[in-house]
Amino acid sequence: MTIAVGKFTKDENDLFDIMDDWLRRDRFVFVGWSGLLLFPCAYFAVGGWFTGTTFVTSWYTHGLASSYLEGCNFLTAAVSTPANSLAHSLLLLWGPEAQGDFTRWCQLGGLWTFVALHGAFGLIGFMLRQFELARSVQLRPYNAIAFSGPIAVFVSVFLIYPLGQSGWFFAPSFGVAAIFRFILFFQGFHNWTLNPFHMMGVAGVLGAALLCAIHGATVENTLFEDGDGANTFRAFNPTQAEETYSMVTANRFWSQIFGVAFSNKRWLHFFMLFVPVTGLWMSALGVVGLALNLRAYDFVSQEIRAAEDPEFETFYTKNILLNEGIRAWMAAQDQPHENLIFPEEVLPRGNAL
């Protein structure tokens, strides 16, 4: 019996090998298998957004002007969510709502579902791109893992939250002022700023900004392998083997400032990864809770005392009154399909009034 030792080689490359060779070859812009998902989805999402903000009105869904064609600017234009009556319909162009009529599809808000779904899969494609490239050059996949934070936030805010509510109508529209309106809505109807998951998200994002600033400044402060270039960006040879800054000096400096300091580069950089990604994930979990109408902290004893005693008021009770005002003033204009009318006497007023 003969035993052949070695690698099995095929006489001919099959279709998979041909595609793999073309997709993953070295070129200026890497394509890869992930590019089959990333590039079409990103193209359609961005293209749909530009089309909507340029030409498409929100008159039929929100009673608003939302395009450059109607006189909006970059801050006020948006691709608006479908009407509440359409609930969670995917609003496919060939579906029963639009029936292949592109104009009707745009009027119904079909561009929003188009942008949201292609955007979500585009972000997932970008994360897979980082996985694929990391594997190709034999790096660990922490970049892709970190990018799961923005994906979690996007999916929770634009997809999971409206799925928990009555329809896509209550998701954010894709525009600057539209996002601001959504933030006010979250505060008024969910008291979002008093939600512990929002607090963790703020701590993560702002803490990461602080860490980034401190880290960048510290490295700049402790450079020692300086060259003779005209400025910092030309002074270093990118292929030099040795490091260009002193971790020991940085450790000594922050030990004197705070009494404690990072002494290990791996722990330092993992912490800089952990803080923002955890913050984003906590925010995403909080929004999933809001989709189910879970409440934030309620300090009922303060509300009861404020209702009984006109002279007792806290920042919490003032915020509760502000939230009531947001709901009363916002609901009527934000949900015109409900035909809400609030008499002047039921609109909330603070104790000072």
UniProtKB/Swiss-Prot annotation:
Segments traversing the membrane: 41-61, 125-141, 153-166, 208-228, 279-295
Modified residues (Phosphothreonine): T2
Keywords: Acetylation, Chlorophyll, Chloroplast, Chromophore, Electron transport, Iron, Magnesium, Membrane, Metal-binding, Oxidoreductase, Phosphoprotein, Photosynthesis, Photosystem II, Plastid, Thylakoid, Transmembrane, Transmembrane helix, Transport
Pfam families: Photo_RC
Keyword Transport in record: yes
Binding site for a plastoquinone: H215, F262
NCBIfam families with a match to the protein in the record: psbD
Protein name: Photosystem II D2 protein
Native source species: Cucumis sativus
Designated gene of the protein: psbD
